[in-house]
Amino acid sequence: MTILSDVKALGQQIWLDNLSRSLVQSGELAQMLKQGVCGVTSNPAIFQKAFAGDALYADEIAALKQQNLSPKQRYETMAVADVRAACDVCLAEHESTGGKTGFVSLEVSPELSKDAQGTVEEARRLYAAIGCKNAMIKVPATDAGIDALETLVSDGISVNLTLLFSRAQTLKAYAAYARGIAKRLAAGQSVAHIQVVASFFISRVDGALDTTLPDHLKGKIAIALAKAAYQDWAQYFGSPEFAALETKGANRVQLLWASTGVKNPAYPDTLYVDSLIGAHTVNTVPDATLKAFIDHGTAKATLTEGVEEAQAQLAETAALGIDVETLATRLQEDGLKQFEEAFEKLLAPLA
């Protein structure tokens, strides 16, 4: 038993926020699963770093450049292969839990963030190309992305809805998921295999606020927001309306805590793992945070602790004139821009 097994027993999955060919082929990912890691997430920045720093890509990049393909097609060829290989490593985990865990995420192109139909078409294409039941397509939680979520769920595709900072936008996503499930059920199709995670970003909130907050609130608001979002989640998925879908096989969306590596060196390096452990959630962590948590983290159900204090902290933040919903919109736009820039940087050497 490891601390990751203890966290899993508390109802939370720990995923790795990293993917590369070396990680899979060296057996390191398989070893992480033995320790208790339950899934993998990727994004354009992760692939950009992998392609630039992992020698195992060099020959394939050279060969792909000899083919009449666009830079994006060359990227997708390698990314799809990596995700498929990671899905294979995670398949035993996936099957051992009846399809509840063991997912690997691949993101649609960042330039589609405001294009619902384009997102749906690319998500369908990528999902088919990977060809694994434990693949999850990552879609940004813009209004267009939430529209796409509804369609993809009705298609039977598992989705990682990413770049959430807003409680209101997260609730919109739950409603879109429920509509997608209802459509699929109305068509007489199974929904039991569909898993959706709502990726709520943590450290970027504190990074944006800590320069403007009084000392006693610094490093507190992201966790407070997550705890409030979890209360929203419990209310939504505990409702009679969702219970009616659940009796027909629908799974609850799971909140996934993302951006949980600590950016401020003044904070404990496991702050955003220790503080956010709760049932029906996922935490995707970078390698360094995973190692730190295994070494000196604490497995305790903390997500439902101090909820009143969290609400008071959010109220105090609002009283200071800080609107966290306005901040959420800005942080999502910043995140989209960062992924677009990473994608451009990723494609440049593939031209």
Curated annotation (Swiss-Prot):
EC numbers, comma separated: 2.2.1.2
Keyword Cytoplasm: yes
Domain of life, per lineage: Bacteria
Any one Gene Ontology BP term: pentose-phosphate shunt
Pathway(s) where this gene product acts: Carbohydrate degradation; pentose phosphate pathway; D-glyceraldehyde 3-phosphate and beta-D-fructose 6-phosphate from D-ribose 5-phosphate and D-xylulose 5-phosphate (non-oxidative stage): step 2/3
Reactions listed under catalytic activity: D-sedoheptulose 7-phosphate + D-glyceraldehyde 3-phosphate = D-erythrose 4-phosphate + beta-D-fructose 6-phosphate
Entry GO CC: cytoplasm
Active site residues according to the UniProt entry: 138 (schiff-base intermediate with substrate)
PROSITE patterns for the chain: TRANSALDOLASE_1, TRANSALDOLASE_2
InterPro entries: Aldolase_TIM, TAL/FSA, Transaldolase_2, Transaldolase_AS
Primary localization: cytoplasm
Keywords: Cytoplasm, Pentose shunt, Schiff base, Transferase
GO molecular function: transaldolase activity
Subcellular location: Cytoplasm
Pfam families in the cross-refs: TAL_FSA
Class of the enzyme per the UniProt entry, highest EC level: transferase
Family classification: Belongs to the transaldolase family. Type 2 subfamily.
UniProt function note: Transaldolase is important for the balance of metabolites in the pentose-phosphate pathway.
Protein name, UniProt field: Transaldolase
Gene that specifies this protein: tal
